[in-house]
A protein has these predicted regions:
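Haloarchaeal acidic low-complexity proteome signature biased toward cell-envelope/secretome components but also
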Residues: 1-53, 59-61, 66, 74, ...
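Short amphipathic alpha-helical segments embedded in low-complexity Lys/Glu-rich regions
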Residues: 63, 79-83
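Short helix-coil junctions and helix-kink-helix linkers
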Residues: 67-70, 86
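Short, positively charged loop/turn segments that connect secondary-structure elements
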Residues: 70-80
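Bromodomain acetyl-lysine reader domains
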Residues: 83-84, 88, 92, 102, ...
Length: 199
């Protein structure tokens, strides 16, 4: 396709459509999860505030725009700055993507810790499927026992950060899942082989 205004417009339109499809697929994947600890009305108001940003937006853009905004959850009150990494390394394709991150504060705080630790690596690129796999692993840990103090999430995020610092590279998503499964089994949680953590 020639590089002209029409081809650039078509490419931008296709990119937006693919992002919407990914967001919808992620929402469908999450439909079986328990309700997030943040009130739906509050999330809707938060998403409306994000519409002033131009997407895709970096974590730095989000924090600059709404970083001091408080989000109340069952676990307590968090600012967006505590949940979204202040970095240009992570981008959000839409307000829905930011909302999806913020609606599970303990997972969001752990992901922020991981993303910020990965910035220290010279050639690491924590994006796409690896980032999604890390987040899905943490969500699965949260779903296993929603009543605990999120010790599993903290243990695995600490393990990932230690690996980044000690080995100076990102652990593979399978290694993260394997470590999460070890943690679960060591703490008496049953993991079936057909589940995400069942490696």
């Amino acid at each position: 396709m020639a590089d002209n205004k029409n081809s650039r417009d078509k490419k931008a339109h296709d990119d937006e459509r693919r992002q919407r499809e990914r967001d919808m697929a992620e929402e469908l994947e999450r439909k079986d999860e328990k309700e997030p600890p943040v009130d739906e009305a509050e999330l809707t108001a938060f998403e409306t505030e994000l519409e002033s940003l131009e997407f895709p937006a970096t974590g730095t853009d989000v924090v600059a725009a709404v970083g001091d905004r408080e989000v109340e959850s069952d676990d307590g009150t968090y600012t967006v700055e505590e949940l979204v990494p202040d970095t240009d390394e992570e981008t959000f394709g839409s307000p829905t993507a930011v909302r999806a991150r913020v609606q599970r504060p303990t997972v969001a705080a752990a992901m922020k810790q991981i993303v910020e630790a990965s910035e220290m690596l010279p050639n690491a690129d924590l994006r796409g499927s690896q980032l999604e796999a890390y987040e899905k692993t943490l969500r699965e840990l949260k779903a296993i026992d929603a009543d605990d103090d999120d010790e599993g999430i903290q243990a695995i995020s600490d393990w990932i950060v230690e690996r980044i610092r000690d080995k100076e590279k990102l652990p593979g998503s399978r290694a993260v899942r394997r470590q999460a499964a070890k943690y679960c089994r060591a703490n008496g949680y049953q993991i079936r082989n057909d589940e995400w953590l069942g490696i």
